C-alpha cells in the first residue's frame, strides 16, 4: 500500500491543506483501485 499522507498541523496554511486533501484523494483512489 502507498503511505497515507501526513495530516498538516493545526496551524497549516490553506495551501498545505489543499495539497494534503489532493494527495489524500489520490491515495484513496489508489487504495480503492487495488482492492477491486
Curated annotation (Swiss-Prot):
**PTM comment, free text:** The peptide YY form is cleaved at Pro-2 by the prolyl endopeptidase FAP (seprase) activity (in vitro) to generate peptide YY(3-36).
Main role? This gut peptide inhibits exocrine pancreatic secretion, has a vasoconstrictory action and inhibitis jejunal and colonic mobility.
Q: Where is it predominantly found?
A: secreted
Record's superkingdom? Eukaryota
For this UniProt entry, which residues form the secretion signal? Answer: none
Molecular function as annotated in GO: hormone activity; neuropeptide Y receptor binding
In-chain residues carrying the UniProt-annotated modification Tyrosine amide: 36
Pfam families hit by this protein: Hormone_3 (PF00159)
Provide this UniProt record's keywords sorted from A to Z: Amidation, Hormone, Phosphoprotein, Secreted
What's in the GO CC field? extracellular region
| Species for this entry | Sus scrofa (Pig)
Site positions (Cleavage) are: 2-3
Q: Which residues carry this modification: Phosphoserine?
A: 13
Tell me its family.
Answer: Belongs to the NPY family.
Q: Where in the cell is it found?
A: Secreted
Q: What is this protein called?
A: Peptide YY
Amino acid at each position: 500500500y502507498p503511505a497515507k499522507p501526513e495530516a498538516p498541523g493545526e496551524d497549516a496554511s490553506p495551501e498545505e491543506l489543499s495539497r494534503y486533501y489532493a494527495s489524500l484523494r489520490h491515495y484513496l483512489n489508489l487504495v480503492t483501485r487495488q482492492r477491486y
